[in-house]
């Protein structure tokens, strides 16, 4: 029965690819078929193998490794992304795309093959070397427009314009400022070849490839079945299944929109059938899928950049991310449960759920994740080598079941998919490097720091609030990776200088860069969910924002209670913060939902909301008042409902 349901859902939403193309720019790829497809996939697979080589074995000059990596990205990028997503012909690539591909890739390969001579001459450049740098940057920006969108180009363009003004006018260099910018942004490791693309080449790329292998191993289907077994029969089961499965699948896919479409094609129809409103069903899936990027052990690409910015082992980043991620999904789970009780919804009949025993027999599919966590946590190997070993383990465990077996043909597909998935992330890293370079070399980062201090009057909460607004606005058009790089360069240092621990400050900007995917007006994950649910897009986005209210609260808890991210704490303190935060989340969820055991009047909603928020503020007094308010409203509702039933 369960397999039939999955098949029916897949048939009903066989236009999932169309939805991905509409809401996810990374999915707007060229259409290759037959022999051309085989050739392009072979190029993508070859690039994936080279990316793995760079991460696992390469011992070469950084400039050589990075320029060869970016050169390959430009080649496979232009083979993958068309100039206009609305005019894509099968097996067609216009001549000008070939020109851009060859010139852009050639510019970086020129640097690669002449790296030693160029580095020795820097900052002096010959005119033709300046021209090569300009060509390479133009090709990179055009690929950025195709793969990640216009907004990040605009942001980078504004910062580059300021950098030109800074050197050309303020420093009096005139047109010589062009050479200065090309030198610093193209040839020196303070721009394109900076921290973001270095992290991408070292370990982000191989983790993306590992994710492609995991997806092809059948682990997503296992996660959905596992979620059904855990929560399917409970009140409002399908929505809880969506939360659990999206959290698990999201940490593999790394894409809010992609996860919404793939798991939502199964879970959203189930939620609607149970009785949830379409806009709520789409919102649940979008909110849960967006949280996949903060779910350890495989988080979004920005989490890997955090390793570079903080100089902290990835295992520590993962460990510190566990409690905030748990609170995020607890908040969504509570909201879903209260909505189910409000609508008197039942769960999925046990006869329609997957049998437990066959499902448990597939638990071996988790082995690659377990091995990865073990390798990373014990620091036995580098992150890249840990991911490489996990890929080998994935191939090995896939042999246990015929339908999941990674044959040579499927391994080829995994490599091609992994290579394709690297393009948009790598391009975003390159452009983020340009932005970060402009910020640091002009001193603009310090000016932004001074401006935030002035506007906030050195008040921590106001500084946090303005940082949150900047992250969300930037995240509406800029990929999470680039958003994090910009905010980590500009706003995170401000928060750190105001006394917030570095890891808490970086998690703060990381979280708010992600929630832009469900925050109106540009809430792409929510809009993808609404398309599947056939609901009003704006209502779906507003519901998703309400469901993910934890994402707007947890970062503040981290800033005010660093124990949430395991900074200068002990076990007792952590337990206390977790308990008070969960109870506080319950209070806020009940206030937003307006229902506990019966409808909650407005005054009591305000009281329980205030109590919930107070419990998230560190301090014995605030916890005491919060418990009194939340507990009082809870007791009043409980005994009131009992009296009503007795009557």
Locate each region found by the language model:
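Transmembrane alpha-helix interface/packing and boundary motifs in multi-pass membrane proteins
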Residues: 211-215, 246-255, 287-293, 436, ...
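Hydrophobic transmembrane alpha-helices that form the pore/transport pathway of multi-pass ion
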Residues: 224-292, 298, 302-305, 311, ...
């Amino acid at each position: 029965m369960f397999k039939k349901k999955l098949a029916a859902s897949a048939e009903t939403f066989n236009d999932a690819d169309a939805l991905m193309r509409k809401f996810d720019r990374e999915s707007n790829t060229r259409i290759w078929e037959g022999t051309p497809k085989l050739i392009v996939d072979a190029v993508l697979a070859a690039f994936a193998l080279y990316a793995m080589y760079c991460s696992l074995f390469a011992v070469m000059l950084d400039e050589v490794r990075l320029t060869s990596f970016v050169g390959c990205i430009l080649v496979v990028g232009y083979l993958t992304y068309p100039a206009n997503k609305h005019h894509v012909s099968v097996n067609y690539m216009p001549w000008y795309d070939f020109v851009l591909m060859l010139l852009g890739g050639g510019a970086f390969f020129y640097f690669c093959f002449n790296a030693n001579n160029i580095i020795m001459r820097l900052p002096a450049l010959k005119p033709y070397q300046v021209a090569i740098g300009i060509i390479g940057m133009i090709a990179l920006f055009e690929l950025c427009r195709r793969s990640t969108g216009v907004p990040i180009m605009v942001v980078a363009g504004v910062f580059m314009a300021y950098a030109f003004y800074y050197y050309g006018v303020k420093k009096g260099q005139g047109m010589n400022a062009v050479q200065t910018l090309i030198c610093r942004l193209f040839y020196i490791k303070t721009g394109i070849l900076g921290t973001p693309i270095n992290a991408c080449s070292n370990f982000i790329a191989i983790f993306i490839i590992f994710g492609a292998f995991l997806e092809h191993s059948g682990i997503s289907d296992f996660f959905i079945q596992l979620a059904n077994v855990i929560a399917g029969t409970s009140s409002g089961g399908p929505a809880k299944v969506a939360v659990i499965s999206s959290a698990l699948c999201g940490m593999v896919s790394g894409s809010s929109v992609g996860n919404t479409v793939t798991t939502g094609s199964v879970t959203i129809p189930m939620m609607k059938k149970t009785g949830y409103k379409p806009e709520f069903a789409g919102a649940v899936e979008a909110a849960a899928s967006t949280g996949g990027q903060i779910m350890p052990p495989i988080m979004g690409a920005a989490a890997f950049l955090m390793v570079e910015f903080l100089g902290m082992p990835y295992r520590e980043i993962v460990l510190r991310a566990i409690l905030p991620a748990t609170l995020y999904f607890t908040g969504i789970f509570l909201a879903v449960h209260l909505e189910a009780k409000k609508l008197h919804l039942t769960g999925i009949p046990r006869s329609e759920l997957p049998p437990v025993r066959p499902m448990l027999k597939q638990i071996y599919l988790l082995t690659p994740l377990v091995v990865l966590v073990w390798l990373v946590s014990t620091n036995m190997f580098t992150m890249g080598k840990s991911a490489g070993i996990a890929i080998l383990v994935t191939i090995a465990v896939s042999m246990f079941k015929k339908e999941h077996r990674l044959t040579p043909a499927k391994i080829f597909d995994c490599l091609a998919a992994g290579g394709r998935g690297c393009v948009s992330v790598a391009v975003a890293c390159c452009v983020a490097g340009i932005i970060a370079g402009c910020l640091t070399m002009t001193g603009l980062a310090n000016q932004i720091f001074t401006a935030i201090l002035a506007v906030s009057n050195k008040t921590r909460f106001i500084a946090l609030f303005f940082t949150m607004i900047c992250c969300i606005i930037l995240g509406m058009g800029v990929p999470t990776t680039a958003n994090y790089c910009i905010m980590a360069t500009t706003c995170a240092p401000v928060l750190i200088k105001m006394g917030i621990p570095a890891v808490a400050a970086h998690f703060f900007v990381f979280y708010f860069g992600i929630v832009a995917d469900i925050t109106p007006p540009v809430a792409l994950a929510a809009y993808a969910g609404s398309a599947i649910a056939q609901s009003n897009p704006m209502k779906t986005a507003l519901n998703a924002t309400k469901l993910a209210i934890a994402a707007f609260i947890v970062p503040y808890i981290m800033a005010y209670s660093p124990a949430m991210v395991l900074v200068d704490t002990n076990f007792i303190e952590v337990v206390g913060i977790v308990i008070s935060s969960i109870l506080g989340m319950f209070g806020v969820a009940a206030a937003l939902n307006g229902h506990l055991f019966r409808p909650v009047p407005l005054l009591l909603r305000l009281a329980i909301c205030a109590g919930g928020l107070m419990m998230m503020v560190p301090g014995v007094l605030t916890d005491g008042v919060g418990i009194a308010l939340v507990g009082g409203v809870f007791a009043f509702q409980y005994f009131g409902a009992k009296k009503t039933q007795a009557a």
